[in-house]
Design a protein with these regions (language model features):
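Short coil/turn segments at helix-helix junctions and helix-capping linkers
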Residues: 133-134, 211-215
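Bacterial N-terminal signal peptides
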Residues: 8-15
C-alpha cells in the first residue's frame, strides 16, 4: 500500500460540516441496493464487503484496485468503496453491543482508492471521512486523497483541510503524518486551482511551521508557503 508514512520515516472553526450535494445525476444507491444487481462480479464484491471477515474485505479491495488500475469502474464499484471507507464508523455491525466491523486499515485503503477514482462524488465521500473518522491513519489518507483529486469549489475542500490542520496544531502531541498529508494536499489544491483565496490557509501553515511537529513537517509547511505564493501569480 502506498501510504505516505514512508515520506516521513516515522513518520476540523466555522460550521463546515454541511456536506455538498451528491454529484448531479449520481444515483444514491447503497451497498444493500446492490443485492438487486444482475452483475455476478458486483454481487461477489458486495458479499465480501458486507461480511465481518476483514480478509474478505481485503479481497474486495484487491479486486477493486485492479479495476481502478485498468480504468474500469462503475457506480456499483463506487458504492462498495463508499461502504468500505465508512466501515465501522457510519456503517456499523454490532454483536452483543460491541462493534465487530471496525477495521481502520480497510477504511484507509478504501479511502486511498477513492482518491485514485477521483471526481465530485469521491471528493464528497472523502470529506465525510475527514469529518467522521476517529482514526488518524484514515484521516491522513483522506487528506492526501483530497489533494490528489484537486477539486476545491468555493474553497470547500481547503476549508475542511485548514480546520483539521488547526485542530491538530492545537494538540499537545499532534500527529506528524496527518499534518504532513494536509500540507501536501493544500499545496496541491493551490497548484491545481491557481492559488487558494482563503487567507486562513497561509495562516494555518505558518502556525504549523511553529507547532511541535518533527522538523520534516515544519520545513514542509514553510516550503508550501513559498510555493503557494507563486501559484496565484
Amino acid at each position: 500500500m502506498k501510504m505516505r508514512y514512508v515520506l516521513l520515516g516515522l513518520v476540523l472553526m466555522a460550521p463546515l460540516w454541511v456536506m455538498a450535494e451528491e454529484q448531479e445525476g449520481a444515483p444514491g444507491r447503497t451497498i444493500e441496493d446492490l443485492f438487486l444487481s444482475q452483475d455476478i462480479e458486483l454481487q461477489i464484491l458486495r458479499s465480501q464487503a458486507l461480511g465481518t471477515d476483514p480478509e474478505m474485505k481485503r479481497l474486495a479491495l484487491r479486486s477493486i484496485r485492479a479495476m481502478v488500475e485498468q480504468g474500469v469502474t462503475s457506480d456499483g464499484v463506487f458504492v462498495v468503496l463508499e461502504a468500505l471507507a465508512s466501515e465501522g464508523v457510519s456503517r456499523q455491525v454490532r454483536s452483543q453491543g460491541a462493534i465487530v466491523n471496525n477495521f481502520p486499515l480497510i477504511r484507509r485503503e478504501a479511502t486511498e482508492l477513492l482518491g485514485q477514482v477521483g471526481g465530485e462524488r469521491a471528493k464528497n465521500t472523502l470529506l465525510r471521512v475527514l469529518r467522521d473518522d476517529p482514526e488518524v491513519v484514515v484521516l491522513a489518507e483522506a487528506a492526501y486523497a483530497l489533494g490528489s483529486i484537486g477539486l476545491n469549489q468555493n474553497n470547500e475542500v481547503s476549508d475542511y483541510l485548514v480546520h483539521t490542520l488547526l485542530r491538530e496544531n492545537a494538540r499537545s502531541t499532534p500527529d506528524n503524518n496527518l499534518a504532513y498529508s494536509i500540507v501536501i494536499s493544500l499545496e496541491r489544491l493551490s497548484e491545481a486551482n491557481g492559488g487558494l483565496a482563503n487567507p486562513e490557509v497561509i495562516n494555518a501553515l505558518i502556525e504549523t511551521a511553529s507547532s511541535p511537529y518533527i522538523r520534516t513537517v515544519r520545513m514542509r509547511a514553510v516550503d508550501a508557503i513559498v510555493n503557494m505564493r507563486d501559484h496565484g501569480r
